[in-house]
Amino acid sequence: MGLEKEKLECSIIMDEDEFNRSIEPILSKKARLYSSAPDRDPHDINAQLKVGFEDVIAEPASAHSFDRVWIGSSATFELVKFIFYRLLTTLLAVPAAFILGVVFGVLSCIHIWLVMPVTRSFLMLLPSIQVVWKSVTDMFITPLFHSMGRSLSSIQVRTSDT
């Protein structure tokens, strides 16, 4: 029993998989706390509707109202815009969605079952019609416009200051 001069080293060795499994519950709880609202306009088709108070009401540097009036006006504008949007969407969103669903359903049906078959039929007939149309154009319309061009090209217009 003497004095020991060696240093002891102690370490914990964990596999990376064990480490990740022990952290997962903590990370998943944090992810649920800070999840953002879903983007309801992912394609930004209503960018022109993102209007704020400063986009509608602007005071030039030479004419400013009192700060409290400006802040109160801004708050009133945003609050009224918010309330009326919520009120109108509450009253009109479901009926408008129903009507638009019917309209787009009918338009899709017409396009799929009427417009596209008729278009395909015309595209099948067009090569033969194109030959006939080119012949009619070459026989009647082209000579007419060539002669009109030659006749009208000899007209000269002079302007005078009187």
From Swiss-Prot:
Provide the assembly information.
Homooligomer.
Q: Which family does it belong to?
A: Belongs to the caveolin family.
Statement: the UniProt record of this protein carries the keyword Repeat: no
Topology in the lipid bilayer: Peripheral membrane protein
- What name does the UniProt record give this protein? Caveolin-2
Where is it localised? Golgi apparatus membrane; Cell membrane; Membrane, Caveola
**Which gene carries the instructions for this protein?**
cav2
**Which ranges of this chain reside in the Cytoplasmic compartment per its record?**
1-86, 108-162
Species, as recorded: Takifugu rubripes
Kindly list the GO CC terms recorded for this protein.
Answer: caveola; cytoplasmic vesicle; focal adhesion; Golgi membrane; perinuclear region of cytoplasm; sarcolemma
Q: Name one GO molecular function term.
A: protein kinase binding
> What InterPro entries does the record point to?
Caveolin, Caveolin_CS
Q: Which UniProt keywords apply?
A: Cell membrane, Golgi apparatus, Membrane
Organism ancestry: Eukaryota, Metazoa, Chordata, Craniata, Vertebrata
Q: What does this protein do?
A: May act as a scaffolding protein within caveolar membranes. Interacts directly with G-protein alpha subunits and can functionally regulate their activity.
Q: Which residues lie within the membrane without crossing it?
A: 87-107
Q: Which GO terms describe its biological process?
A: caveola assembly; cell differentiation; insulin receptor signaling pathway; negative regulation of endothelial cell proliferation; regulation of cytosolic calcium ion concentration
Where is it mostly found? Answer: Golgi
User: Which Pfam families does this one have?
Assistant: Caveolin
Which superkingdom does the taxonomy of this entry point to? Eukaryota
